[in-house]
Amino acid sequence: MANSWRISALADRHRALGSNLEDWNGMGTAWTYSGNLADQHEAIRTKAGLMDVSGLKKVHYVGPHAESLLNWATTRDVSKLYPGKSVYAAMLNEDGKFIDDCIVYRTGPNAFMVVHGSGTGYERLVRSAQGRQVAVLFDDDLHDLSLQGPAAVDFLAEHVPGIRDLPYFHHLQTRLFGKPVMISRTGYTGERG
């Protein structure tokens, strides 16, 4: 495994399943397992598969200036979002050059969560907040699992009432297996999401 400074809660489980863990965004991440890669691909495309995407960075952006600053830091009008709605956006630097992509989740009237990749989105959000009424919290205790594939919603429907009614690019707070979770329908790999 590469030298990672972030640890997935599932790292031991990934190793037990045969992954060597590769660095992604500073976190040891399972890209492959010891089984047949074609079988793993086929399972996700025809049934369902669970992927640990905890390497994505999660940033909570909260305060009276959060909305206007996100409008400035991203390419989307986040004022159109209401709690429970999310949007895919690009992040640009002061010169208008692409620095990261993200999904912005509105979690409350003045509260957002920005989930971004390996670019410099976090730094952009921190710079935008300086001297403004907004708190910025990088959350490395929040882990992402991506359940994808045509049978994904069938599995969740057994455990989360009303999940079939969740619109695309919306999210909800609920419980799954007795634990508090946020479930979002934000996948974009070709099926329901």
Annotated model-derived regions:
Residues 1-92, 97:
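Acidic, proline/glycine-enriched N-terminal capping motif
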Residues 100-193:
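Acidic, low-complexity central loop/insert segments
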